[in-house]
Amino acid sequence: MNLHEYQAKALFAEYGLPVSEGFACDTAQEAVEAAGHIGGDMWVVKCQVHAGGRGKAGGVKVTGDKEEIRAFAEHWLGKNLVTYQTDEKGQPVAKILVESCTDIANELYLGAVVDRATRRVVFMASTEGGVEIETVAEETPELIHKAIIDPLTGPQPYQARDLGFKLGLNPTQMKQFTKVFMGLAKMFEDHDFALLEINPLVITDEGNIHCLDGKIGIDGNALFRQPKIRDMHDPSQDDAREAHAAKFELNYVALDGNVGCMVNGAGLAMGTMDIVNLHGGKPANFLDVGGGATKERVAEAFKIILSDSNVKAVLVNIFGGIVRCDMIAEGIIGAVKEVGVEVPVVVRLEGTNANLGRDVLASSGLDIIAAESLTDAAVKVVAAAEGK
């Protein structure tokens, strides 16, 4: 689960971090009034969506004219913003963030992630703020400095000072940076973050550290113990199919291909997508029905896959460990009959009751293409998607 920038900054403020005064507005009139309340003669207005690249897409504007704020809000509210991180439909804009304008002398980067390699929370800092950190990591990795947080001792001020020294901060800025670092580390642990970014973390003309942006991703598995964070969820930013799948405990991610995939197990699902790609196809989705799949969940998975008009063929790849292949076969048959599937369906069953599952499919009278191996399944589904 992701938070909007205005929500992230509200959390920053709760932990004593320096942020700009700002208001998230639902209407153009509110945006104009917010600028008046903030005061000053320059403001920044930003579309609130769960995607980066807003500035290049026209979703951020710096202005000293309140009528331009009104025009910006009227233009974007209720529309979709398309950036390089969204699909072609973009993300809906329901709020506009109006903030005071901050003078910038230098831009830095500060972020944290749960790193699987070290099994620790790792903070990253760089002098290359204001640009995509992935680009910095690829082109100039030596400019990214790290601090690994020991879960037993927690974050330490010396780690902040070490990062600050590498960023070239002066003693006053070092104290401010240490406060920001310690606050973010506590926030990360308190609220079960999976990702945190301030890009850019700026040094103002007065020489002060300031959080100019905020990006937060929450570990979805921890939401049951984070009611405050859970209430911040904006369902309008979710893919409708992904949100629907979650209700049935299906792990679904929409992609842009034409081969629908239904698999049990995340690893097998990724392997299935890889082999479809290897044989010239493009997966339309990632869908893991899980080890405890039922006939109802399989039927619902079919409905979700087929709700994508780009899907030209469906590959069902099931390895029966916990789940029984004959039960999956019955679910497939029920789904095909209920939904009225009009695209080719390729099925590969292995494991518990696999032979029985194949017999169930063979005796169903439905036009289902059986596959003997994963390679055979990939070849057949790619050919079917191409109409061969």
UniProtKB/Swiss-Prot annotation:
Keyword check for Metal-binding: yes
Residue positions binding Mg(2+): N199, D213
Pathway(s) per entry: Carbohydrate metabolism; tricarboxylic acid cycle; succinate from succinyl-CoA (ligase route): step 1/1
Co-factor note (free text): Binds 1 Mg(2+) ion per subunit.
Domain of life (superkingdom): Bacteria
Entry GO MF terms: ATP binding; magnesium ion binding; succinate-CoA ligase (ADP-forming) activity; succinate-CoA ligase (GDP-forming) activity
PROSITE patterns given in the database record: ATP_GRASP, SUCCINYL_COA_LIG_3
Keywords: ATP-binding, Ligase, Magnesium, Metal-binding, Nucleotide-binding, Tricarboxylic acid cycle
Assigned EC number: 6.2.1.5
Any Pfam family matching the protein: Ligase_CoA
Record GO biological process: succinyl-CoA metabolic process; tricarboxylic acid cycle
GO CC annotation terms, alphabetical: cytosol; succinate-CoA ligase complex
ATP-grasp domain mapped to chain residues: 9-244
Binding site for ATP: K46, G53, R54, G55, E99, T102, E107
Binding-site positions, substrate: N264, G321, I322, V323
Catalytic activity: succinate + ATP + CoA = succinyl-CoA + ADP + phosphate; GTP + succinate + CoA = succinyl-CoA + GDP + phosphate
Coiled coil: none
Function: Succinyl-CoA synthetase functions in the citric acid cycle (TCA), coupling the hydrolysis of succinyl-CoA to the synthesis of either ATP or GTP and thus represents the only step of substrate-level phosphorylation in the TCA. The beta subunit provides nucleotide specificity of the enzyme and binds the substrate succinate, while the binding sites for coenzyme A and phosphate are found in the alpha subunit.
Subunit (UniProt): Heterotetramer of two alpha and two beta subunits.
Similarity annotation: Belongs to the succinate/malate CoA ligase beta subunit family.
PANTHER family registered for this protein in UniProt: SUCCINATE--COA LIGASE [GDP-FORMING] SUBUNIT BETA, MITOCHONDRIAL, SUCCINYL-COA SYNTHETASE BETA CHAIN
Protein name: Succinate--CoA ligase [ADP-forming] subunit beta
